[in-house]
Amino acid sequence: MGRKVHPIGFRLGIIKDWSAKWHASDKNFAECLTEDLKLRKAISKKYVDAAISQVDIERQSNKVTVSVRTARPGIVIGRGGQRVDEMRHFLEDLIGKKVQLNIVEISQAELDAFLVARSVAEQIERRVAYRRAMKQAIFRSMQAGAKGIKICASGRLGGVEIARREVMHEGRVPLHTLRADIDYGCTRAHTALGDVGIKVWVYRGDILPEAKEKSESAVTEMAAVMADAPAAVVTETKVADIAAKPKRVVKKAEAEIPAEEKPKRVVKKAENITKEEE
């Protein structure tokens, strides 16, 4: 009871992608996973103030590509790319492999769930009232174009002795809709009285599948139907679409096809139509 599925894991392979893209045998899997954890920990520890949201890792044969998503790329890159080179050499020494470091800028930090959670946590650590911090974060995200947002803070809120949880939300956050683009992030605020957990869900709209472009024109489809094409080529849906089109459009389209490309039935039918018109 009360268990919630992870919003990003629930949508993997549908509208979300994996943050680690590699395959390893059973023998090397533990080693690769340990390297991933080392890389992520080293990057987050070195760039504490760089507003890093996510670290994506891809592996080739003898090369590891690390993509860092950050809202402050200038801090990560440094003057003339100096800090990037230093970080790349450090990561190569850490795992003993060649590392390619890519920096990806986040244009709107207010729509990134982890960065929103991190901003709320930093305000709580500076002794700002948690309700005020949550309301400001919600207002900024909605102003930036979010369709909905929910923030949950749990712990010794306000310094009380008994820990509790408080939730604030605005707009829609459809957790069970797979096409809904929901970003999720969580972090901790370290206070003198203990840790306060912050969870954020940001609904950024729906991701709809792109409309499939029709590879064949109405003329080709009509010719395939009349030539008794296989069922794999002409489906019931295509036949229904062709039948629904006006006869004038079909006749005009048939007339534009060269005679040598038409099936015999189409050629005969076109000749009959021409005779009738005469």
Swiss-Prot record:
This is Small ribosomal subunit protein uS3. GO terms for cellular component: cytosolic small ribosomal subunit. Residues 255-278 are annotated as: Disordered. The gene is rpsC. Binds the lower part of the 30S subunit head. Binds mRNA in the 70S ribosome, positioning it for translation. Part of the 30S ribosomal subunit. Forms a tight complex with proteins S10 and S14. Residues 39-107 form the KH type-2 domain. Keywords: Ribonucleoprotein, Ribosomal protein, RNA-binding, rRNA-binding. PANTHER family: 30S/40S RIBOSOMAL PROTEIN S3, SMALL RIBOSOMAL SUBUNIT PROTEIN US3C. One of its GO terms (biological process) is translation. Belongs to the universal ribosomal protein uS3 family. One of its GO terms (molecular function) is rRNA binding. SUPFAM superfamilies: Prokaryotic type KH domain (KH-domain type II), Ribosomal protein S3 C-terminal domain. Gene3D superfamilies: 3.30.300.20, Ribosomal protein S3, C-terminal domain. It comes from Dehalococcoides mccartyi (strain ATCC BAA-2100 / JCM 16839 / KCTC 5957 / BAV1). Pfam families: KH_2 (PF07650), Ribosomal_S3_C (PF00189).
